[in-house]
Amino acid sequence: MANNVMDSSFKKEVLESDLPVLVDFWAEWCGPCKMLTPIIDEISKELQGKVKVLKMNIDENPNTPSEYGIRSIPTIMLFKNGEQKDTKIGLQQKNSLLDWINKSI
């Protein structure tokens, strides 16, 4: 299961991570976000030890999404070595996400 990350812990949990980090930006009121949750949780289990998977609620943590220009959700960002590597916007299929992650890391 993916852990939550907050504005206050984003730098430590994401930018300073030794592992690549996948961040799912979401909101409680977002239907596609809710549909993506089980997919993100499965990916978190499958890639445990290879990729850190985190979720950020944009309503509770407005600063980080604003810094990264997030205008639509769900938005999934992949970070590696403290830098944003790639972004996917909208509901994604599990296999498509896994392929994307594996190519990006």
From Swiss-Prot:
Ranges where the Thioredoxin domain occurs: 1-105
Family that this chain belongs to: Belongs to the thioredoxin family.
GO cellular component annotations of the record: cytoplasm
Function statement: Component of the thioredoxin-thioredoxin reductase system. Participates in various redox reactions through the reversible oxidation of its active center dithiol to a disulfide and catalyzes dithiol-disulfide exchange reactions.
Coiled-coil region(s): none
Pfam families in UniProt: Thioredoxin (PF00085)
Gene name per UniProt: trxA
Single GO term (MF): protein-disulfide reductase activity
Protein name: Thioredoxin
UniProt keyword list: Disulfide bond, Electron transport, Redox-active center, Transport
Domain of life: Bacteria
PANTHER family named among the record's database cross-references: GEO12009P1
UniProt entry tagged with the keyword Disulfide bond: yes
Cystine pairings recorded for this chain: 30-33
Entry keyword Transport: yes
InterPro entries the UniProt entry points to: Thioredoxin, Thioredoxin-like_sf, Thioredoxin_CS, Thioredoxin_domain
